[in-house]
Amino acid sequence: MGFTGPLKYNKWKIKIAALRMYTCCVERIDYDEFFEKCSLPDTLNSWFLVTQLHVWMCLVRMKQEGRAGKYMCRYIVHSMWEDVEQRGKVMGIDSVTLKNSMRSMTEIFYAAIFGYDEGIISDDRILAAALWRNLLNKQCDDPRKLELLVEYVRKQVQFLDTLDGEDLLLTGEVVWRPLVEKDAQSILKPSTPTYNDEGL
């Protein structure tokens, strides 16, 4: 059928789910914790860097859902740019400066996506380098911060992989794990049923 054939679900439902998923990226993240643990200033740019990391994790998950998932990815990103523009206007940034900032953010976003994609399929050193470049702006002298971020991304992507694709396409509902978590293994669903000694 090719790319132009009908999608598995109604396009409007997918767009609404995409907006909901993006909303989960901005409303369910503890930005103050990220700013504190990563020594980031409380600015629009820092907000954007943390948001784009979570948007990227959603894109990684939704690309696994075929054409409908890729269609949803377009609208997650579209929702992000609309939100960035609105936040800039609310902050009183003039239109020329905002346009230039958004152009710069677009370049940053696609460079980050490339780096994060490479990092997630590689080892922790590559992912740490991508986080250092893109989230921390090459300003981190504490390797424990990078270790925390690498662990966070790995556990979050692993958790998102356990979520049902059909539900994600229809609802866009995503729950985020805390940045600092005592037992990261607690997020994983058991891959096989567990039984006691009696086989129950």
UniProtKB/Swiss-Prot annotation:
Keyword terms of this UniProt record: Membrane, Mitochondrion, Mitochondrion inner membrane
Domain of life, per lineage: Eukaryota
One annotated GO biological process: mitochondrial respiratory chain complex III assembly
A Pfam family the protein falls into: Ubiq_cyt_C_chap
Signal peptide from the UniProt entry: none
Major site of localization recorded for this protein: mitochondrion
Subcellular location: Mitochondrion inner membrane
InterPro entries given in the database record: Ubiq_cyt_c_chap, Ubiqinol_cyt_c_chaperone_CPB3
CC terms in the record's Gene Ontology section: mitochondrial inner membrane; mitochondrion
Function recorded in the entry: Required for the assembly of the ubiquinol-cytochrome c reductase complex (mitochondrial respiratory chain complex III or cytochrome b-c1 complex). May be involved in cytochrome b translation and/or stability.
Family: Belongs to the CBP3 family.
Name listed for the protein in its UniProt record: Ubiquinol-cytochrome-c reductase complex assembly factor 1
Naturally occurring in which organism (per UniProt): Xenopus laevis
